[in-house]
A protein has these predicted regions:
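Flexible loop/hinge segments at secondary-structure junctions
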Residues: 1-136
Length: 136
């Protein structure tokens, strides 16, 4: 997880200071990639900013919750719109609403920006909105 990487950088730095016989290197590569690499035995520790799917949970996998993550939707400050409903967000991300005027804003196209496919933050956001996506 790239969103967990900053916290892990600090924890790894402190661990490395007091455990000179070992070394932890942190790489934020995305939640799905981190989980997959642990399950395949490529790495010993992985980071995820989302819950694991049933297919990702292995017998030998230990999951330790270290924090809760927050999600926010932001709109450019020049946009006069002050709020969106969950249904409007759903329809924007599904491509059904493509212009701000359809949700009370100016007559301008909506440019949706999101995280990469393997992002745990994106997965959590899509799950909360009810958007479906298959993760291998």
């Amino acid at each position: 997880s790239t969103s967990v990487a900053r916290v892990m950088d600090v924890l790894a730095e402190e661990f490395n200071k007091s455990h000179t016989d070992s070394f932890i290197a942190v790489q934020g590569i995305g939640s799905t990639a981190g989980i997959t690499m642990v399950n395949k035995g490529v790495v010993e520790l992985g980071m995820s900013s989302r819950y694991l799917t049933e297919s990702e949970k292995g017998e030998d996998l230990n999951v330790d919750l270290i924090a809760y993550d927050g999600l926010a939707v932001v709109i450019n400050r020049s946009n006069t719109l002050s709020n969106l409903t969950q249904e409007q967000l759903y329809n924007i991300y599904k491509g059904k609403i493509t212009n701000w005027k359809l949700v009370g804003g100016e007559d301008k196209p909506i440019a949706v920006v999101t995280r990469e496919t393997s992002s745990g933050t994106r997965y959590s956001f899509e799950s909360l909105l009810g958007l479906t996506r298959i993760i291998n």
